[in-house]
Amino acid sequence: MNTSLFVRPEQRQAWQQLQTLAQAPAVHLRDLLPQPGRSHGLQYQAAGLSLDASHQRVNANILSALHALAEESQVLDKAQAMFRGEHINRTEDRAVLHVALRGRAQSTPPWGAEISQAVSAELTRYTAFAQALRHRQITGHTGEPITDVVNLGIGGSDLGPRMATEALWPSDDGFHPPPVQVHYVSNVDIWQLAKTLSALHPARTLFVVQSKTFTTQETLTLFASAKRWLVDGGCPADQCHQHLVAVTAKPALAQSLGFHAERCFHLWDWVGGRYSLWSAI
């Protein structure tokens, strides 16, 4: 697939056709809905989802132009290139394989068995850790179980997991809090971290430091402040690792900063921040 040339969508012939169709007099839905076969012809199913477009003001000409635009833009070819692991991220010269994180088990995945096996192994690791955390089996330096998790990260390392936590927070009956409280800090200004930690106890707090490269200055600053809080709260410096988890593409660098190997979960460099929710993030 040749990706060296980029043609803007509005420069394509199908786009011009769509613009012409958009300028046509609007047709009311009451005139479209009675058309024979409309409901069946505009219903689609894929990946467990059902889509009914029959109540949109589209017709055969519009659909044909949309399909033509997709073909002219080589959407399918580019999607297949992504699945094969080609470096379609031209800015960073990387693959874009977040789909491997959420792909179902396949005998011959387009991204290769090696990647699937690595993803499966990492999923098993961090799922087991999360389950142990929920069952109060993860302890701090005093032997007390961890009751609070503080997520340190910015961008996709904050927004995705924060959304999931808020969406899935209620227990089965909707009243009882989860066994472990999760807090998020993304502002390098010390006030947000200080406010969060003011209600927590160092012996029962675990920090999850999310950084693909461990070079993000904001995250490193928050991490340094968190370690200082642990030590000031009575945790021996050589025991801080019991209160630290790293999610990163650079586990060796994380370990050089004090994280233990078993508490480093892998985030591949082919996972973009906005898609990292499907990883250990």
Regions found by a protein language model. Name each.
Residues A128-R136, T142-I281:
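Glycine-rich phosphate-binding loops that contact phosphosugars or nucleotide phosphates
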